[in-house]
Amino acid sequence: KCNPKGFTNEGCRGIDKKHWNSQCRTSQSYVRALTMDSRKKIG
């Protein structure tokens, strides 16, 4: 199953295991950056 966000609650799943970690870390970092930015704007 594919996840639009590129990661799931259980972990990150990519097409290839070699890119699995890199895609996971990039996605999480990107989401965290947006979350922090949103909190700063709202708060």
From Swiss-Prot:
SUPFAM superfamilies from the UniProt entry: Cystine-knot cytokines
A molecular function GO annotation: nerve growth factor receptor binding
Q: Which GO terms describe its biological process?
A: cell surface receptor protein tyrosine kinase signaling pathway; modulation of chemical synaptic transmission; negative regulation of neuron apoptotic process; nerve development; nerve growth factor signaling pathway; neuron projection morphogenesis
For this UniProt entry, which segments traverse the membrane?
A: none
Q: Does the keyword Transmembrane helix apply?
A: no
InterPro entries, A to Z: Cystine-knot_cytokine, Nerve_growth_factor-like, Nerve_growth_factor-rel, Nerve_growth_factor_CS
Q: Which Gene3D superfamilies does the annotation name? A: Cystine-knot cytokines (2.10.90.10)
Keywords for this protein: Growth factor, Secreted
Main location per the UniProt record: secreted
**Location in or out of the cell:** Secreted
A GO CC term assigned to this protein in UniProt = dendrite
**Keyword Secreted among UniProt keywords:** yes
| Similarity field | Belongs to the NGF-beta family.
Record's PANTHER family? BRAIN-DERIVED NEUROTROPHIC FACTOR, NERVE GROWTH FACTOR NGF -RELATED
**Functional summary from the UniProt entry:** Promotes the survival of neuronal populations that are all located either in the central nervous system or directly connected to it.
Which protein are we looking at?
Neurotrophic factor BDNF
Query: What organism is recorded for this protein?
Result: Raja clavata (Thornback ray)
Gene for this protein?
Answer: bdnf
